[in-house]
Curated annotation (Swiss-Prot):
Similarity comment text for this entry: Belongs to the UbiA prenyltransferase family. DGGGP synthase subfamily.
Intracellular or extracellular location(s): Cell membrane
Protein name: Digeranylgeranylglyceryl phosphate synthase
Domain of life of the source: Archaea
GO cellular component entries: plasma membrane
Membrane-spanning intervals of the chain: 12-32, 35-55, 88-108, 125-145, 146-166, 200-220, 224-244, 255-275
Enzyme Commission identifier(s): 2.5.1.42
Main location as per UniProt: membrane
UniProt xrefs under PANTHER family: CHLOROPHYLL SYNTHASE, CHLOROPHYLL SYNTHASE, CHLOROPLASTIC
InterPro entries, sorted: DGGGP_synth, Prenyltransferase_related, UbiA_prenyltransferase, UbiA_sf
Pathway noted in the entry: Membrane lipid metabolism; glycerophospholipid metabolism
Length: 275
């Protein structure tokens, strides 16, 4: 058994990002007050996210044999039946760990598992529906951290909404990048439906709204670290807005959006400190 192969399979860097997102939601909701169980929502989110990545690779194996033959499943480093069982274990452990957090967090964990499974099994091919599910489950990582602290609503809703729309725009950009492969595989993305230029316009409108509204959290309780950080990060989005509406630009934009996503988690987290 290769540990490296399993870390690749769960996309460990993405899982860490999900955990950081949950941590952000938690510290915003509690104003950095920790209970002995503060780590549980981080574990729940990490395990369920990992399970989602694994089951996604299970259903994507035929496509990955062509597009990503080096991945653990198509390369044969991990057997498909083993990966399927591994995803079940990850989902089950994540769900069990959510029980001490209460009925509502348990329910959210269960719903997220169902969404991730159905996305991998069939909803991904619906394109726009799949984009919304990816955006929703990404945003739920932040929301879950706040929810697990005992709050249904609070300032943690702000980054949750922000993450949803940012991820949605990133999914549209990814659809532009993957348009040829999606056409061949019958994935009905927005880019396949409308074409790359129209999809670029929609993605840029969303990013433009995010830039315009990005200072608002400062006036809703986040500190000056947030304001300075988000305005600096907005430069990346402005650069994306001036890129040409092409497939090549989508590849460049996606790389910049990864940097922006990490930076946003940091500035929202530090921006919740009471200074």
């Amino acid at each position: 058994m290769s540990v490296k192969a399993y870390l690749e399979l769960i996309r460990v860097h993405n899982v860490v990002g999900s955990a950081v997102s949950a941590f952000m939601g938690y510290v915003i909701a509690t104003t950095w007050k920790f209970t002995p169980l503060f780590f549980l929502p981080l574990l729940v989110v990490s395990l369920i996210a990992a399970g989602g990545y694994v089951i996604n690779d299970v259903y994507d194996i035929e496509v990955d044999k062509i597009n990503k033959p080096e991945r653990p499943l198509p390369s044969g480093r991990i057997a498909v039946n083993i990966a399927r069982r591994f995803s079940i274990v990850l989902f089950a452990v994540g769900l069990i760990i959510s029980i001490p957090l209460g009925l509502i967090p348990f329910g959210f964990a269960l719903i997220t598992i169902v969404l991730l499974y159905e996305y991998a099994r069939s909803l991904k091919k619906l394109g726009l529906v799949g984009n919304f599910i990816v955006a929703l489950t990404s945003a739920l990582s932040a929301y879950y951290g706040g929810l697990a602290s005992g709050s249904l609503l609070g300032n943690f809703i702000i980054p949750t909404i922000y993450i949803f729309f940012f991820t949605l725009s990133r999914e549209f950009v990814k659809g532009i990048e993957d348009i040829e492969g999606d056409k061949r595989n019958g994935v009905n993305t927005l880019a396949v439906k409308l074409g790359e230029k129209s999809t670029w316009i929609i993605a840029k409108i969303i990013l433009g709204i995010l830039i315009f509204t990005s200072p608002l959290p400062y006036f809703l309780g986040f500190n000056v670290i947030y304001l300075i950080g988000i305005l600096a990060l907005d430069v990346l989005l402005v650069y994306i807005l001036i890129l040409h509406n092409t497939i090549e630009s989508a590849t460049k934009a996606r790389s910049l959006m990864k940097i922006y996503a990490i930076g946003t988690l940091i500035v929202f987290t530090l921006g919740s400190l009471r200074i």
